[in-house]
């Protein structure tokens, strides 16, 4: 059999890359090989080819210029955590929160599946940079794929193409990412709009710094720069090299006086991360501005001044569409005006898109995400609950001026929070870095109707990284503690909970843009200006410490309820941490045991129901 020509451009100098491409072509047997240059012409050509093949639908140029709708196979609509593997050399290094198979065994399985898997298809080679080109915080990857959907989405989500190849000299390191939909075509066989395979594997080899994904064309499983590289592999790199790869938004906060701070925040899914990253402050808080650096992932390295600096390694937003509206996130809606790819949303008769929550009243008629006619009241969603938009980040009207700064932005505070209807107060500042790491390690959200288990049960999601940490979670906690010890000026750590409810099940806090009031207090604490009260959990704002302009109906009593600490509920909360901590026991930081005991001791000494009012239990700072 003749070797498949790889047609490498003359500019490709990296010997490891050339060897890997040759080996992959021999294994996967594509009909042709295409080196992606990242040009507009290439993007337009691939989009037009997918329109012709039925994969893409061109949206109205008047309503949504240069944008496309794609419908996936109904079996391929989300990340598949049960088919996601961390194949470290030693099982114990993957830890109990990850699926593990021995690397040798997994490679044998994958090689059988990959043999001939690209027959009848084009093999695309996508050189991409996670982070601004040339940044000391950035890292380069190369994805090989047989999916033009992946190529077009990667052009929006990463800096990709010829400029990245130019950075890869003979010896430069890169992360190899191999992806196939696992649907070879025999000569003359008709393709389907969304090829995929029932057998799926998303596999990470942390010591080799490599990724293989087979069988799925969906975003998180196929856009390998995102969760696979930017979190699972990068978190393993970060542990070895002394930095942090985190599932965090990054935003800028500017005061009326022009003082600028940057904050990174981690929330589990369905807790409003993108909304927070693009928040619009209440009109009464004139002069305060929020800018967006990133909405999903942060790579954070130490600067020469002993502070932490973060970049958003991505170049676009891959957001959940349902629930996004002019009311909940007007900046996201403005970002979606053009040049986007929409996956599994509904199509309107006039060639635009729609999803649940976009408007109060749905249109009279739609074509749903499966291509079927849809009318209001037909008892099925028009858009899939995990429908997505892929949008260029530079289109965001509040994108931060430093979002592409190769040195990153200095982080003043970390914020952690889950969705909790009781127990957890609106906001509190941890006593120190160690308490803050414990706070983040034990955070969680109540299970919703969509998740297995009893509604109201708390699913622990440490640092919002449970599905994304590429090594043992106990080692991850230790790594955070170690990073804190090396900093001369560490960010302050805060816990928040926008979702506490009253006795009638109604949210106590209005959320959305009103969260700016809490953020203003956090920034005040960072600079030592805002007053706080010592509580059993850490430092909390007094009623007078928050800016209430424009929220006149929010009474002192309501705020007191929102901030209260119930001794019995918190004892149960601390005892409930045991399930997660026991699972990680052999590698759990010893500090955690002491912190838990100290918190219990503080609770024993506090009143049965701690509130902000009683002066004898408070100390102003």
Swiss-Prot record:
<keyword id="KW-0963">Cytoplasm</keyword>
<keyword id="KW-0479">Metal-binding</keyword>
<dbReference type="Pfam" id="PF00821">
    <property type="entry name" value="PEPCK_GTP"/>
</dbReference>
<keyword id="KW-0464">Manganese</keyword>
<dbReference type="InterPro" id="IPR008209">
    <property type="entry name" value="PEP_carboxykinase_GTP"/>
</dbReference>
<feature type="binding site">
    <location>
        <position position="247"/>
    </location>
    <ligand>
        <name>Mn(2+)</name>
    </ligand>
</feature>
<keyword id="KW-0547">Nucleotide-binding</keyword>
<dbReference type="GO" id="GO:0071333">
    <property type="term" value="P:cellular response to glucose stimulus"/>
</dbReference>
<dbReference type="GO" id="GO:0019543">
    <property type="term" value="P:propionate catabolic process"/>
</dbReference>
<feature type="binding site">
    <location>
        <position position="388"/>
    </location>
    <ligand>
        <name>GTP</name>
    </ligand>
</feature>
<keyword id="KW-0312">Gluconeogenesis</keyword>
<feature type="binding site">
    <location>
        <begin position="512"/>
        <end position="515"/>
    </location>
    <ligand>
        <name>GTP</name>
    </ligand>
</feature>
<dbReference type="Pfam" id="PF17297">
    <property type="entry name" value="PEPCK_N"/>
</dbReference>
<dbReference type="GO" id="GO:0004613">
    <property type="term" value="F:phosphoenolpyruvate carboxykinase (GTP) activity"/>
</dbReference>
<dbReference type="InterPro" id="IPR008210">
    <property type="entry name" value="PEP_carboxykinase_N"/>
</dbReference>
<dbReference type="GO" id="GO:0046327">
    <property type="term" value="P:glycerol biosynthetic process from pyruvate"/>
</dbReference>
<feature type="binding site">
    <location>
        <begin position="218"/>
        <end position="220"/>
    </location>
    <ligand>
        <name>substrate</name>
    </ligand>
</feature>
<dbReference type="GO" id="GO:0006094">
    <property type="term" value="P:gluconeogenesis"/>
</dbReference>
<feature type="binding site">
    <location>
        <position position="296"/>
    </location>
    <ligand>
        <name>Mn(2+)</name>
    </ligand>
</feature>
<dbReference type="GO" id="GO:0005829">
    <property type="term" value="C:cytosol"/>
</dbReference>
<feature type="binding site">
    <location>
        <position position="419"/>
    </location>
    <ligand>
        <name>GTP</name>
    </ligand>
</feature>
<dbReference type="InterPro" id="IPR013035">
    <property type="entry name" value="PEP_carboxykinase_C"/>
</dbReference>
<feature type="binding site">
    <location>
        <begin position="386"/>
        <end position="388"/>
    </location>
    <ligand>
        <name>substrate</name>
    </ligand>
</feature>
<feature type="binding site">
    <location>
        <position position="269"/>
    </location>
    <ligand>
        <name>substrate</name>
    </ligand>
</feature>
<comment type="pathway">
    <text>Carbohydrate biosynthesis; gluconeogenesis.</text>
</comment>
<feature type="binding site">
    <location>
        <position position="227"/>
    </location>
    <ligand>
        <name>Mn(2+)</name>
    </ligand>
</feature>
<keyword id="KW-0210">Decarboxylase</keyword>
<comment type="similarity">
    <text>Belongs to the phosphoenolpyruvate carboxykinase [GTP] family.</text>
</comment>
<keyword id="KW-0342">GTP-binding</keyword>
<dbReference type="InterPro" id="IPR035078">
    <property type="entry name" value="PEP_carboxykinase_GTP_N"/>
</dbReference>
<keyword id="KW-0456">Lyase</keyword>
<feature type="binding site">
    <location>
        <position position="79"/>
    </location>
    <ligand>
        <name>substrate</name>
    </ligand>
</feature>
<dbReference type="InterPro" id="IPR035077">
    <property type="entry name" value="PEP_carboxykinase_GTP_C"/>
</dbReference>
<feature type="binding site">
    <location>
        <begin position="270"/>
        <end position="275"/>
    </location>
    <ligand>
        <name>GTP</name>
    </ligand>
</feature>
<dbReference type="InterPro" id="IPR018091">
    <property type="entry name" value="PEP_carboxykin_GTP_CS"/>
</dbReference>
<feature type="active site">
    <location>
        <position position="271"/>
    </location>
</feature>
<protein>
    <recommendedName>
        <fullName>Phosphoenolpyruvate carboxykinase [GTP]</fullName>
        <ecNumber>4.1.1.32</ecNumber>
    </recommendedName>
</protein>
<comment type="subunit">
    <text>Monomer.</text>
</comment>
<dbReference type="GO" id="GO:0006107">
    <property type="term" value="P:oxaloacetate metabolic process"/>
</dbReference>
<dbReference type="GO" id="GO:0030145">
    <property type="term" value="F:manganese ion binding"/>
</dbReference>
<dbReference type="GO" id="GO:0033993">
    <property type="term" value="P:response to lipid"/>
</dbReference>
<dbReference type="GO" id="GO:0005525">
    <property type="term" value="F:GTP binding"/>
</dbReference>
């Amino acid at each position: 059999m003749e070797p498949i020509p790889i047609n490498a451009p003359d500019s490709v100098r990296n010997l490891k890359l050339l060897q890997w491409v040759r080996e992959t072509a021999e294994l996967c047997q594509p009909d042709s090989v295409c080196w992606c240059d990242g040009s507009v012409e290439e993007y337009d050509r691939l989009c037009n080819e997918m329109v012709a093949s039925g994969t893409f639908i061109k949206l109205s140029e008047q309503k949504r210029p240069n944008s496309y709708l794609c419908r996936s196979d109904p079996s391929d609509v989300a990340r598949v955590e049960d088919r996601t593997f961390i194949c470290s050399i030693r099982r114990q290094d993957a830890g109990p929160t990850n699926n593990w198979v021995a690397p040798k065994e997994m490679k044998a399985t994958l090689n059988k599946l990959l043999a001939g898997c690209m027959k009848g298809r084009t093999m695309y080679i996508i050189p991409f940079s996670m982070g601004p080109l040339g940044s000391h915080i950035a890292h380069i990857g190369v994805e090989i794929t047989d999916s033009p959907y992946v190529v077009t989405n990667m052009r929006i989500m990463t800096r990709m193409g010829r400029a990245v190849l130019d950075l890869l000299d003979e010896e430069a390191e890169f992360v190899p990412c191999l992806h196939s939909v696992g649907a070879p075509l025999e000569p003359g066989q008709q393709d389907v709009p969304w090829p995929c395979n029932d057998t799926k594997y998303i596999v990470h080899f942390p010591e080799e710094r490599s990724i293989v994904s087979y069988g799925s064309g969906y975003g998180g499983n196929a856009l390998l720069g995102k969760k696979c590289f930017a979190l699972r592999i990068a978190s393993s790199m970060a542990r070895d090299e002394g930095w942090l790869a985190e599932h965090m938004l990054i935003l800028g906060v500017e005061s009326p006086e022009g003082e600028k701070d940057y904050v990174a925040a981690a929330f589990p899914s369905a807790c409003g991360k993108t909304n927070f990253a693009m928040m619009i402050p209440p009109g009464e808080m004139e002069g305060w501005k929020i800018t967006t650096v990133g909405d999903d992932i942060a790579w954070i390295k130490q600067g020469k001044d002993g502070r932490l600096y973060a970049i958003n390694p991505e170049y676009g937003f891959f957001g959940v569409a349902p629930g996004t509206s002019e009311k909940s996130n007007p900046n996201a809606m403005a970002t979606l005006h053009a040049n986007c790819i929409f996956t599994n949303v509904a199509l309107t008769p006039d060639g635009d898109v729609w999803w649940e929550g976009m408007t109060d009243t749905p249109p009279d008629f739609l074509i749903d995400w499966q291509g079927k006619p849809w009318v209001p009241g037909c008892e099925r969603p028009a858009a899939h609950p995990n429908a997505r938009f892929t949008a260029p980040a530079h289109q965001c009207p509040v994108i931060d001026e430093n979002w592409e700064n190769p040195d990153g932005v200095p982080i003043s505070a970390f914020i952690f929070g889950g969705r909790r209807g009781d127990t957890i107060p609106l906001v509190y500042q941890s006593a120190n870095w160690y308490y803050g790491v414990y706070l983040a390690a034990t955070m969680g959200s109540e299970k919703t109707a969509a998740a297995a288990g009893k509604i109201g049960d708390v699913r622990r999601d440490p640092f919002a990284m449970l599905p994304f940490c590429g090594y043992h979670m106990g080692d991850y906690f230790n790594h955070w503690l170690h990073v804190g010890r090396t900093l001369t000026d560490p960010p302050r750590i805060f816990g928040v909970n926008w979702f506490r409810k009253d006795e009638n099940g109604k949210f106590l806090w209005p959320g959305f843009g009103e969260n700016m009031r809490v953020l203003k207090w956090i920034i005040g604490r960072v600079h030592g200006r805002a007053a706080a009260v010592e509580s059993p959990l850490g430092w909390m704002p007094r009623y007078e410490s928050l800016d209430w302009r424009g929220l006149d109906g929010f009474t002192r009593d309501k705020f007191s309820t929102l901030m209260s600490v119930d001794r019995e509920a918190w004892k149960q909360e601390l005892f409930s941490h045991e399930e997660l901590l026991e699972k990680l026991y052999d590698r759990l930081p010893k500090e955690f045991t002491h912190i838990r005991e100290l918190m219990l001791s503080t609770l024993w000494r506090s009143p049965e129901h701690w509130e902000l009012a009683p002066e004898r239990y408070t100390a102003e700072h």
